[in-house]
Amino acid sequence: MVTILQLLVSILILLSFALVVGVPVILVSPGEWERSKNLVYASAGLWFGLVIVTAAFNSFVI
């Protein structure tokens, strides 16, 4: 159980880092927002879902 929680947290950290670096680059690049808008929204939705799943799973571990 703890290993799964550690894996979820690691994925959350990696996705957070990718979003922190990637979203500003997409917003600054000319014309990139129109092409990558769906990817940004999908990544943000995945991040939010991962936060909820990690929090729910954490309540079972501790």
From Swiss-Prot:
Belongs to the PsbZ family. Its main location: plastid. SUPFAM superfamilies: PsbZ-like. The chain crosses the membrane at residues 8-28, 41-61. It comes from the Eukaryota. It is a multi-pass membrane protein. May control the interaction of photosystem II (PSII) cores with the light-harvesting antenna, regulates electron flow through the 2 photosystem reaction centers. PSII is a light-driven water plastoquinone oxidoreductase, using light energy to abstract electrons from H(2)O, generating a proton gradient subsequently used for ATP formation. The gene is psbZ. Coiled coil: none annotated. PSII is composed of 1 copy each of membrane proteins PsbA, PsbB, PsbC, PsbD, PsbE, PsbF, PsbH, PsbI, PsbJ, PsbK, PsbL, PsbM, PsbT, PsbX, PsbY, PsbZ, Psb30/Ycf12, at least 3 peripheral proteins of the oxygen-evolving complex and a large number of cofactors. It forms dimeric complexes. The keyword Transmembrane helix applies. This is Photosystem II reaction center protein Z. Keywords: Chloroplast, Membrane, Photosynthesis, Photosystem II, Plastid, Reaction center, Thylakoid, Transmembrane, Transmembrane helix. InterPro entries: PSII_PsbZ, PSII_PsbZ_sf. It is found in: Plastid, Chloroplast thylakoid membrane. GO terms for cellular component: chloroplast thylakoid membrane; photosystem II reaction center. GO terms for biological process: photosynthesis; photosystem II stabilization.
